[in-house]
Amino acid sequence: MNLSLNKLIGQRPDIQYGKTERHTPDWLFILWMGGTALLSYSLVYALRKPFTAAEFEGLTVAGMDYKIVVSIIQLIGYVCAKLFGIKYISELQPQNRLKFIIGSAALSEASLLAFGLLPLPYNIVALFFNGLSLGCMWGVIFSFLEGRRTTDILASIMGVSMALSSGVAKSLGLYALNQLHVSEFWMPALVGGLAFPLLCFMGWMMTKFPRPTAADIAARSVRVTLNGQQRWALFKQYMPLLLLLFVANLLLTVQRDIKEDFIVCIIDVDTISSWLFAQLDTIATLVLLSTFAVLAFSGNHLKVLYTLLGLSTASMGVLALLGSGEVQLSTTLWLFLQTLCIDIAYLSFQTIFFERFMLVSK
């Protein structure tokens, strides 16, 4: 029997279904919520990715390059958190979101301090907990935005923070290394220490977002927590598609992490400005935001899904061409295309794809 998501979830007597109306103009509402979410996840990146600016040249662990080891360790922690999040995020009550954000950010910064304090090679374990503590943050922040008529554009604004903040985190890390002469092991803690209090403040700001209105719920359906039985019923109904999407998303996550972690080793960073990563990622961010904004205004949910899949497939084709070595490009253009193509595919899944998927199955 083909059950809709609403039937699987049902109405919850303990949830207020849009009893208040929002009087804030839509454009101001989008700027407020989208901007806060964008800054929040940018700060998450500052806690997770500044170490990618370091090369750790000449260091090894058990015969393997040190940076490869720490990147793998952090990625394992991050993926483990994603798997735990399937259960945890779906059951997280709204009143506990801020506690989760503060606790996760605190554990992340503590792990970065441990990375600087502990001797080699034992400090690599600290980055496992760094990845573990931050792997669910996307889902928690996104839960403040979902279930609204403006969710597509809000999610797009939040999503492009990944493209923007990645370059900014690297540029901050390179600035700390090259201009402030901070060691490669303490640089992540310095950048993370600046981000931690700001992320806590942004988390508090998100608790002030208004609830979805009656019009939001009528257009997008109410979002409530799911217990184990409801999750299993939903998974069984869409199992083949969800498994394919899960594998694709996992591979994109790994591919993006490899690119983010080792790009400073692939190119000669001594020949470029420390802020080139931030500049290129800002341009890519504007392209992505424009693309997702156009799709956000489409009411044909199935057409949007097909468009996102088409864009993702095309971007992977361009990446394959770049990786083949058949095309000779300047460093700047190569970096830009790498960022744009990976983020088109990755952010499609992270932002509006699953929101529209839920609406198609409504």
Give residue ranges: language-model regions.
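Transmembrane alpha-helices of Major Facilitator/SLC transporters
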Residues: 273-300, 315
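C-terminal ends and interior cores of transmembrane alpha-helices
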Residues: 104-119, 312-327
